[in-house]
Each structure stands twice: as structure tokens, then as C-alpha cells.
Amino acid sequence: MNSTVSMTVIGAGSYGTSLAITLARNGHNVVLWGHNPEHVGALQRVRCNQKFLPDVSFPDSLLLETDLIKALTASRDILVVVPSHVFGEVLKQIKPHLRPDSRIVWATKGLEADTGRLLQDVAREILGNEIPLAVLSGPTFAKELAAGLPTAIAISATESAFGDGLQQLFHCGKSFRVYKNPDFIGVQLGGAVKNVIAIGAGISDGMGFGANARTALITRGLAEMSRLGAALGADPSTFMGMAGLGDLVLTCTDNQSRNRRFGMMLGQGISVEEAQYQIGQVVEGYRNTKEVRALANRANVEMPIAEQIYQILYCNKNVIEAAQALLGRARKDESDNVRS
């Protein structure tokens, strides 16, 4: 492996693979590492991810690696694409093998398991304050990205030069548009809250409530996202962009979203456990709901939709009762978004 590798991707699931394919299509040498050697070996043999993206062949410049140390030393820039509940553990695993000049970017959407901390806080605690960090977030379904369909996304970095470099690496005038955003907190937060609201939109559709109700949930969900962001110091305008409204609309309205499909099953009377089993992949919003609630409680921010979804997922509340609780709330002015 040589020094011309532009990026090492940690995580060979559907999203990690699709981002690696995108970078390789842009003419960059990319290393893709996964924790399961058998899975990575299969990717190398058939030159595609048959499990998640069976119709997309790997470009020649996408290199597979089973040795973590070789993968991490191949490139200065490391893209972490793993579920949020293992994000911290993965950073601990890679830390001893990072190069002195390494920089970390993640496309993981969510918060730290159980604590609800932002992933930037997890990264700083594990990796220290000196290493440059960045986050990639926005409305991206892996299959469409891997197929080269037009997509737009946001990047935020702790160092401007790092953000500029990432924008240049990922940006492709034919299909992939990348917007820089200086709001590091807001870009992270949008990707976590939208998962929760997408479950709610799915529940609503599963109950047969229709397009009016779904749109109301999206709109009021955006208000909850913005309130929490403001309390944490985010720029409110971020939530009208790719990492906020863009990702929220995508995951609330399209059945490629696991969170939405999970919610639809709940709305149809399927149990939480059975719905997770039927999805067959990680439903980020399940854990994100608990984490967002913890974060909102610490920030003293009211998030009624997120609270009712938490009650359904973790307190066995009936979906009809949860819907009635939201519809029966006190009358308010729409502009009263600061507190409620």
C-alpha cells in the first residue's frame, strides 16, 4: 500500500461502502476496512458489496484491507462510518495506530449510547484536543449514493483547511454536491434528531393518519430539532439546510429509511422487538430516541414528539395514546418555538 491513498474508510456496511465508492469514482485511491475479515474477503473476491449494494461494482481504486494497522497508516485522513452506539469503542480501537498527522471525519449519525453526548465530545475525550475533526451529514441513502444518483450533503470541520480538503475530495460536479457549514454542533445534531422524528412519521403512516399528519410531524419535529440546537449553541439556520431539513424530509418520507419502516411497523401494531428483527439492520433511531431525550432533559428543552416516541419504545405506551397526547396538548402560537 502506498502514500497516494486519499482516505481510509472504517466501516464496510452499506453507507461506508457507498462513500468509499464515491471517493474512488472521483479518482482517489481509497482503503475500505471492516471488522469482519470474512465479509471484507468476500468484498475483495467479488468486487462488490453483495449484502448491501449487490448491483454496484467497485472501482479499481477502491482497495480492501483486513489489517487495521495497515489501513490506518495508509492515509492521513480517516473516515469513520459505524453505528453510533459503537462509535466510541471504534475510536478507542483505532487510536493506538493513528499516524501523528491523522485527521478524523465521521459520517456516523447519532449521539453517544446512554449518555446522549455529541460525538465530538466522545472524540475529544478519546483522541484529545489536538487532532482535527470533521463530520459529514445530510440526506443520503446508501443505494442512491453508490449508484451515482445526484446527492447533496454538508461537511463541518474544526479546522477550515480540513473542511476545504474534504469538500474537494468528495465533491463531484456530475452527481455529488458538498456544502461546507461552520456549525459543527448543528451538523451533528440534525443527523441524530431526524432519526427520532422519522420513527414518528412512520408510526403516523402505519396508523393510516395520512399526508397531513406526516407533514405536521415533520414541521413540528423540525421545531424540536431547532430548539434543542439553539440550547446547545448551534446556528438555527443549519437546521434549514442539508443536515437538518434535508435529512429530516428524506428519512420521514421514503421507505428506504429503516427508521421510517420501523415506525410504520409499530403503527401497524407490531412489537418493538419484532419490528427490529424484521428490519434486519441497525435502527439508529431506536437508541437515538433515548439519547436525544437525555440530551434534551439536560438542556431543559421540551421535545413533545421525541418524548412520546420514547414512551412508545421504552415504556410500552400504546401508539394511539401517544398520538392523543400530542393532539391534546394545549393551544399555542406557531411562532412560540423557543420553549414549546
From Swiss-Prot:
It catalyses: sn-glycerol 3-phosphate + NAD(+) = dihydroxyacetone phosphate + NADH + H(+); sn-glycerol 3-phosphate + NADP(+) = dihydroxyacetone phosphate + NADPH + H(+). GO terms for cellular component: cytosol. Keywords: Cytoplasm, Lipid biosynthesis, Lipid metabolism, NAD, NADP, Nucleotide-binding, Oxidoreductase, Phospholipid biosynthesis, Phospholipid metabolism. NADPH binds at S14, Y15, H35, K109, A142, R258, V282, E284. The active site is at K194 (proton acceptor). Its EC number is 1.1.1.94. It is found in: Cytoplasm. InterPro entries: 6-PGluconate_DH-like_C_sf, 6PGD_dom2, G3P_DH_NAD-dep, G3P_DH_NAD-dep_C, G3P_DH_NAD-dep_N, NAD(P)-bd_dom_sf. Sn-glycerol 3-phosphate binds at K109, G138, T140, K194, D247, S257, R258, N259. SUPFAM superfamilies: 6-phosphogluconate dehydrogenase C-terminal domain-like, NAD(P)-binding Rossmann-fold domains. One of its GO terms (molecular function) is NAD binding. Pathway: Membrane lipid metabolism; glycerophospholipid metabolism. The keyword Oxidoreductase applies. GO terms for biological process: carbohydrate metabolic process; glycerol-3-phosphate biosynthetic process; glycerol-3-phosphate catabolic process; glycerophospholipid biosynthetic process. Catalyzes the reduction of the glycolytic intermediate dihydroxyacetone phosphate (DHAP) to sn-glycerol 3-phosphate (G3P), the key precursor for phospholipid synthesis. HAMAP family: NAD_Glyc3P_dehydrog. PANTHER family: GLYCEROL-3-PHOSPHATE DEHYDROGENASE, GLYCEROL-3-PHOSPHATE DEHYDROGENASE [NAD(+)] 2, CHLOROPLASTIC. Belongs to the NAD-dependent glycerol-3-phosphate dehydrogenase family. This is Glycerol-3-phosphate dehydrogenase [NAD(P)+]. It comes from Photorhabdus laumondii subsp. laumondii (strain DSM 15139 / CIP 105565 / TT01). The gene is gpsA.
